[in-house]
Amino acid sequence: IRDRANPFLGYRAVRIYEEYASLFTTQLRSILRASAHGSLKIMIPMISSMEEILWVKEKLAEAKQQLRNEHIPFDEKIQLGIMLEVPSVMFIIDQCCEEIDFFSIGSNDLTQYLLAVDRDNAKVTRHYNSLNPAFLRALDYAVQAVHSQGKWIGLCGELGAKGSVLPLLVGLGPVSYTHL
């Protein structure tokens, strides 16, 4: 993949999987094979549409069938999750809950994309604020929507590491926090 002006947007994560479908299938098969030896989950980054979710699920089903045909053991109930980091997916969480087992909010990327702030551009970094009311509403909406469907949701990124924000995060309800 060639260098791009803004590598955080555009062609990365789930968006490259189709071009590299055979590599993606190999990775899925490897994860599935490893799942026979311990508890594993699969989480897909940069999801922005149901079409991407359904494509990933199709590839996962194909990889599972290949392993069944080869009599290779794996966890049939391996969970599939997505990162909530592209704002468009926030508006289809209800549909995502029908197809996905768990969610993780990528606070760094979601803040950047929701507020249209390039974290690496010194002229606009002052606008990068995970405590912006719009971001907090999005966070609350995601947690409530996912919980209403009985699904697990976590939070990763810098926001989860800020001790001063912990009371606010606890107020959202049961969410796991990870600093990445």
Spans of model-derived segments:
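Conserved alpha/beta-domain cores
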Residues: 1-180
